[in-house]
Structures are given as structure tokens and as C-alpha cells.
């Protein structure tokens, strides 16, 4: 028995069950991924014990020479990975990364232009229930009702009318390529700054499979998990002229001591992302997403914008008897994890929704490829054709578990 199993069997049991879920269920939540053993080893290290307020070479605590090495490695690797002037690897999350940028260049009441949450944006891009919507005057933009892609005519019209100080680009449920050059051109017409939140597509950007926002934006924020396949955390890239202000708005502005064990895990993940194999992995994520999207559409599912260019897709259930909530629950019983999601021009509550979101990063980390995506589409269709049929859903779960058993990832942790 492990030390944890001996001392706290309740926690140990929960961890084991979650390991089994990640090993044998099909994880299709677009914002989730599975890290490498090296990343987990770094995150579970003694660095969790060390306080290190400040920045490398300028700490408020002694004994930081080793963690300085780790943070500098993370910074330099991040800059190399994305071609950035400056990187701050201390944000605990993507939300805090966004907050730090806002506080660096905005005052309460300033106007920002951000993507409507129900059209695919993110809470921190100006949702009224989030700090971003409470502190700032938010003008939301969205997608065209015809194409379900970003309506740049609307973005330009709103920018000219409201003269935002900052235009926020990025999304949590947008399956198409983001045109950073178009946003930059609009921002320049009104003298606005640009912040790109590339949390969902950072891995694709690092691999050159999605245009980089770095040349077009004063600030680029991201999480370090999702497609980047690192630990749960955040990061900010910016132009050198904003580096000092940005750093001070992370610490002491909105955070105290950085999480050095997480920064170590970020450093390891960035090294992985700099390796040639990472591009092949990202290419497979996109191939899997496109195959799955095509197969779902063949089976009669409607996808927002008619497909995907990246790692995710949004299934629109409008006009069917299903809701996103019902679909999520049925698929969960079939061993397939997705999340209910609002769709553009949503008519239902965000607790119910008319759609669900699917992503391929975690399944790709397991080793699934195009052939398996054909099977996955069949599993999804079978489960959603049998909502309420517990026996049939259990049968589908058996097929899912058998499929995932062919692609072990953390099996050694279950011995």
C-alpha cells in the first residue's frame, strides 16, 4: 500500500476511481487533456513547499536560487515556443492572466469589446456574472446568424461606435480559425489595444497549425493545459514595453506567492512542446477533430458553422427533442464525457442549453487516431438514440471501455 492509501484511504480511493475514469472512459471535454508522467512528477515535487514572492533574482524570500532556475527555464522556453518578447509564467489560471492584463491597461469603467459568451466567448471576456463584466463597460460582439462565424462587419461597427480601449479576441467554443490580422486592423482604426486569449488553441499555435497572435496583439494570454498539454495554470506573453507593468499587476497586484511546483510542470510541458513530436501530436488532434466532425454530420448531427478547423466542435441540438443537459448525462452513462454548451442565438437556460461541446486533445493523448474517431461517432450516435435506455447505455459504455483499454495511458498507476 502507498503512504496515502495507508494514511487517508478515502482520498486515495477517490484518486484511484478518477484514474480509472481517465483511463477507461472517453474524455471529450475540449478544455481537458492528460499530462505526461514527467509533468506530473514535476508538479508533485518538493517545490510545492517553497514560497517565492517576486521574480527570479528579485525575491522577497531567501533560499530561492533553485526555484529561480526553474522559473527562468519556464520563461525562456515560453518565449522560444511562441516568439514573444516577454513571458510571465506565474498566473495561477487563465482567468487571472486575463485579469492582470485588464488591470495593466484599463481603469474601472473603461470600454472593452469581447466575444459574447453564448456565441463562443469566455466568462472573463466581459460576461456580466464575471469580474470583467462588473469592472468594465463591455460591448459584446458575436457570430453571423448565417455562417455562425465571427461577423467582422459587426465587430468594426461596434468598435467605431463605442471606441473601446481594449479589444479581446479568443473563445472557449469557437471551432474556426481566428483572424487576428482582421482584429488588429479594426483596433488600429479606433486606437485600441488587442489582447488575445489563446487558451484553447495554444498548442496548435505552438505547432504552427493555427496563425500566431503574437505579431498582432500587445498581450497574449493562455492556459497551460488544454491543447498545450501542461499543468492547469496560466501564462501571459506581451511586448517588452508592457513587461514591467504586467509583472507588477501579477505580483503584488492580484497574486501573492507563485506556485513553484506548477511553474516547474509548465517548464517541463514547454520543453515537450518544443520537441518535433509535439507537432505530430497537434496534427493528430486536428485530424481527429475533422474526422469526428465529418462522421457526426454523416449521422445527421448539426455542427455550429458546419464543422471545425481546430480541436473542437459544437453540436447544435436546436430543433431536436434533446437538450445539452440531457445529452451530457446520457453520454456520461455511456462512458463518454462532454459538456453541455450554449449555441449561438441560444434560447435555453445555460443550465440546460441547446448544444454540447466536443474536443479531441485528451483522446489524442491516449493515442486514438482517425479510425477510432469513426467508432467514437458511432458510440455517440448510439447513446443519443437511446436516451433513457439504461441497458443500452451500459452496453455502449462497455464498448467505450473496451476501446480505451486498447490505448493505455496511466495503467501503471492502477497496478
Curated annotation (Swiss-Prot):
Record PTM N6-(pyridoxal phosphate)lysine, positions in chain: 226
Record-linked CDD domains: SHMT (cd00378)
The protein's required cofactors: pyridoxal 5'-phosphate
Job description of the protein: Catalyzes the reversible interconversion of serine and glycine with tetrahydrofolate (THF) serving as the one-carbon carrier. This reaction serves as the major source of one-carbon groups required for the biosynthesis of purines, thymidylate, methionine, and other important biomolecules. Also exhibits THF-independent aldolase activity toward beta-hydroxyamino acids, producing glycine and aldehydes, via a retro-aldol mechanism.
HAMAP family recorded: SHMT (MF_00051)
Subunit: Homodimer.
Name of the protein in its database record: Serine hydroxymethyltransferase
Organism for this UniProt entry: Geobacter metallireducens (strain ATCC 53774 / DSM 7210 / GS-15)
Amino acid at each position: 500500500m502507498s503512504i496515502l492509501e495507508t494514511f487517508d484511504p478515502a482520498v486515495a480511493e477517490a484518486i484511484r476511481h478518477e484514474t480509472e475514469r481517465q483511463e477507461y472512459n472517453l474524455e471529450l471535454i475540449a478544455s481537458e487533456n492528460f499530462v505526461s508522467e514527467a509533468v506530473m512528477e514535476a508538479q508533485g515535487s518538493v517545490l510545492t513547499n517553497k514560497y517565492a514572492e517576486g521574480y527570479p533574482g528579485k525575491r522577497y524570500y531567501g533560499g530561492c536560487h533553485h526555484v529561480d532556475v526553474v522559473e527562468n527555464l519556464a520563461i525562456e522556453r515560453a518565449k522560444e515556443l511562441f516568439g514573444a518578447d516577454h513571458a510571465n509564467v506565474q498566473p495561477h489560471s487563465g482567468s487571472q492572466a486575463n485579469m492582470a492584463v485588464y488591470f495593466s491597461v484599463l481603469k474601472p469603467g473603461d470600454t472593452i469589446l469581447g466575444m459574447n459568451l453564448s456565441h463562443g466567448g469566455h466568462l472573463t471576456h466581459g460576461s456580466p456574472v464575471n469580474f470583467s463584466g462588473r469592472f468594465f463597460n463591455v460591448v459584446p460582439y458575436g457570430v453571423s446568424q448565417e455562417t455562425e462565424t465571427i461577423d467582422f462587419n459587426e465587430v468594426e461597427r461596434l468598435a467605431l461606435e463605442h471606441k473601446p480601449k481594449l479589444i479581446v479576441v479568443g473563445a472557449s467554443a469557437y471551432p474556426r480559425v481566428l483572424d487576428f490580422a482582421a482584429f488588429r486592423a479594426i483596433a488600429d482604426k479606433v486606437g485600441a489595444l488587442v489582447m488575445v486569449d489563446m487558451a484553447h488553441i495554444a498548442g496548435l499555435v505552438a505547432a504552427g497549425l493555427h496563425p500566431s497572435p503574437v505579431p498582432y496583439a500587445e498581450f497574449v494570454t493562455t492556459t497551460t493545459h488544454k491543447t498545450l498539454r501542461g499543468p492547469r495554470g496560466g501564462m501571459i506573453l506581451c511586448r517588452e514595453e508592457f513587461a514591467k507593468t504586467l509583472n507588477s499587476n501579477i505580483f503584488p497586484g492580484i497574486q501573492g506567492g507563485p506556485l513553484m511546483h506548477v511553474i516547474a510542470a509548465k517548464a517541463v510541458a514547454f520543453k515537450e512542446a518544443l520537441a518535433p513530436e509535439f507537432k505530430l501530436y497537434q496534427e493528430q488532434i486536428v485530424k481527429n477533430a475533422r474526422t469526428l466532425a465529418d462522421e457526426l454530420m454523416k449521422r445527421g448531427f448539426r455542427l455550429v458553422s458546419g464543422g471545425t478547423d481546430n480541436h473542437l466542435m459544437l453540436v447544435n441540438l436546436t430543433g431536436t427533442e434533446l437538450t445539452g443537459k440531457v445529452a451530457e448525462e446520457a453520454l456520461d452513462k455511456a462512458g463518454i464525457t462532454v459538456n453541455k454548451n450554449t449555441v449561438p442565438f441560444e434560447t435555453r437556460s445555460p443550465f440546460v442549453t441547446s448544444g454540447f461541446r466536443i474536443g479531441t486533445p485528451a483522446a489524442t493523448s491516449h493515442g486514438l487516431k482517425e479510425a477510432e474517431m469513426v467508432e467514437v461517432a458511432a458510440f455517440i450516435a448510439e447513446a443519443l438514440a437511446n436516451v433513457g435506455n439504461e441497458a443500452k447505455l451500459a452496453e455502449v459504455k462497455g464498448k467505450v471501455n473496451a476501446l480505451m483499454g486498447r490505448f493505455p495511458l496511466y495503467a501503471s498507476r492502477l497496478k
